[in-house]
């Protein structure tokens, strides 16, 4: 998977410390995020066993991707109404840019 390779490639250079994904368990706007987790989380975690990848479910929350870098800097991207492939691209975009 491209996202797994992207994380391995940039983690050290950018000081990536953590990835968090916030989503709702049942809202239509979070469906693509749920699909992404179901299809790609295991591969992503296997490729990056030392990187915390946190999945946070909460009712009625807007789906969002957070990347935390060194010195507490964070970057976030809304994932509302994204497909699983769009979530993958959003993850790759966040990882390819510095906080």
Swiss-Prot record:
GO cellular component entries: mitochondrial inner membrane; mitochondrial membrane; mitochondrion; respiratory chain complex I
Gene3D superfamilies attached to this UniProt entry: Glutaredoxin (3.40.30.10)
SUPFAM superfamilies documented for this protein: Thioredoxin-like
Keyword field: Acetylation, Disulfide bond, Electron transport, Membrane, Mitochondrion, Mitochondrion inner membrane, Respiratory chain, Transport
InterPro entries attached to this UniProt entry: NADH_Ub_cplx-1_asu_su-2 (IPR016464), Ribosomal_mL43/mS25/NADH_DH (IPR007741), Thioredoxin-like_sf (IPR036249)
Main location: mitochondrion
Cystine residue pairs: 24-58
Protein's membrane topology: Peripheral membrane protein
Free-text function comment from the UniProt entry: Accessory subunit of the mitochondrial membrane respiratory chain NADH dehydrogenase (Complex I), that is believed not to be involved in catalysis. Complex I functions in the transfer of electrons from NADH to the respiratory chain. The immediate electron acceptor for the enzyme is believed to be ubiquinone.
Record protein name field: NADH dehydrogenase [ubiquinone] 1 alpha subcomplex subunit 2
Protein source organism: Bos taurus (Bovine)
Taxon lineage: Eukaryota, Metazoa, Chordata, Craniata, Vertebrata
